[in-house]
Regions:
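Glycine-rich active-site loop/strand segments that organize a redox cofactor
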Residues: 40-81
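N-terminal Rossmann-like FAD-binding beta1-loop-alpha1 element of flavoenzymes
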Residues: 3-31
Length: 96
């Protein structure tokens, strides 16, 4: 029996977390997004934006936000974290 295959629409935090959760259960997931990079909405926010919740409450399942990003994670660091999340979980992407 071959593993199930799922397409997840959106390479933002929700889509990436869904793909990681599926992968943890042995389900192959492909994340598709019309933009060319993960976390595209975060990339468009203003430069000085920080998360409004502390780092320890803001991570996605299976990979906490690293301490090096500080307690109040900046916009650029959220983007970097999402990219690390993809690599950590080996999430398959089809972007653009």
């Amino acid at each position: 029996m071959s593993p199930a295959q799922v397409v997840v629409i959106g390479a933002g935090p929700g889509g990436l977390a869904a793909a990681a959760a599926l992968g943890a259960r042995g389900v192959q997931a492909l994340v598709v997004d019309r933009d060319s990079q993960v976390g595209s909405s975060w990339r468009r926010h203003y430069e000085r934006l920080h998360l409004h919740t502390p780092r320890r409450w803001s991570g996605l399942p299976g990979y906490p936000i690293p301490r090096r990003f500080g307690r109040w994670v900046a916009r650029a660091d959220v983007v970097a974290y999402l990219e690390e999340y993809v690599a950590h979980h080996g999430i398959q992407l089809r972007l653009g």
